[in-house]
A protein has these predicted regions:
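Active-site catalytic-loop/activation-segment of kinase and kinase-like phosphoryl-transfer enzymes
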Residues: 1-15, 116, 160-199
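Juxta-kinase regulatory segment immediately upstream of eukaryotic protein kinase catalytic domains
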Residues: 1-38
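ATP-binding glycine-rich phosphate-binding loop
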Residues: 31-54
Length: 199
């Protein structure tokens, strides 16, 4: 699969066929696609997320969709958000090594990121809902935030590098808009998209 192919969403059934020749993925899980076990584990609103296990390891394959996953194509979103996620992850890895999954491959045309599978890690939200005690969470999040925010700031970066970062991420309008509205604004008033406040 190359970035020049028309976008096509992956599925559990098509992933091995479409990514079986991807050297980055095969180098982490093995080339024999008949031994690949593919599970779709995405529990979010926006992306497809697969765990792919093979003879020699496992990886995560994440693909953006051109719409909000839980709503459908009536709420379109640009695929370029995977471009911003890829660049954010590479910067976070450089600024706070070991704090985010390693990136194995990025295909901009397919809005696809292949990354390290961090087992037995789980999504933080799940641990919090289950009431798990996480004694190091404040320290770990604090260190990650301090390292990435300071090392990505004017105080640490060369001016030309900082301006290049600002220019790169300035076009990430749609995903920022969703976060700002759906997470920080809409839950607190009778917003048009809120279903729980409708009769």
């Amino acid at each position: 699969m190359t970035g020049k192919s028309p976008f096509e969403a992956l599925s559990v059934e098509t992933l091995a066929v479409r990514l079986g020749s991807n050297e980055a993925l095969c180098s982490h899980i093995g080339k024999d696609t008949s031994r690949w076990k593919v599970r779709e584990v995405g529990d979010g609103n926006l992306n497809l997320v697969f765990i792919v296990e093979g003879a020699t390891g496992a990886a995560v394959v994440k693909q953006a969709l051109p719409y909000v996953r839980l709503v459908g194509d009536s709420w379109p979103l640009p695929l370029k958000r995977s471009f911003f996620e890829y660049h954010a992850l590479t910067r976070q890895q450089a600024r706070a090594p070991g704090s985010v999954p390693a990136i194995h491959h990025f295909d901009e045309g397919q809005a696809l990121i292949i990354m390290e599978y961090l087992s037995p890690h789980i999504i933080l939200r799940r641990a919090l809902i289950e009431g798990r005690q996480l004694p190091n969470i404040a320290r770990d999040i604090g260190l990650f935030m301090a390292r990435t925010l300071f090392r990505g700031s004017d105080l640490h970066m060369a001016t030309k590098d900082r301006k290049a970062d600002l220019a790169l991420f300035a076009d990430n309008v749609e995903l920022c808009d969703i976060t700002e509205n759906l997470v920080f604004s809409d839950p607190y008033f009778d917003a048009k998209m809120n279903r729980h406040t409708s009769p």
